[in-house]
Amino acid sequence: ISGIYDFEPILYCSENKGIRLDKLEAKAASTIYRQLTLNIPNIIAFGLNEPPEMQRQSIDFANVLCTASNNTELIKINNADHFETVDTITDENSRLFAQTCKLFGLF
């Protein structure tokens, strides 16, 4: 849910002053660059009020997962940032709630 899958952009942000990642560390920490071989169901969800870079990372990571798994669900949450996207998982009327329940075999 609204994850950071590519740490390389952090190298060029003020946040990296505290984190102090170098290019190799950023790539090693980035899930998007790992070779994924498990064919398991995945849900990638993000809010449409997220910054464009966060949206791009979610879409790109979902595409990477699609190459490793035929069962990847990309869910875009209207009028939500990452906090509100997390709240959506408990909304029984939301697609995220329904897909999460399905993932865990709850219905």
Which residues does each predicted region cover?
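The feature captures the conserved acid-bearing segment of alpha/beta-hydrolase catalytic domains
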Residues: S2-V64
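C-terminal catalytic histidine-bearing segment of alpha/beta-hydrolase fold enzymes
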Residues: I43-A45, Q55-A62, C66-F107
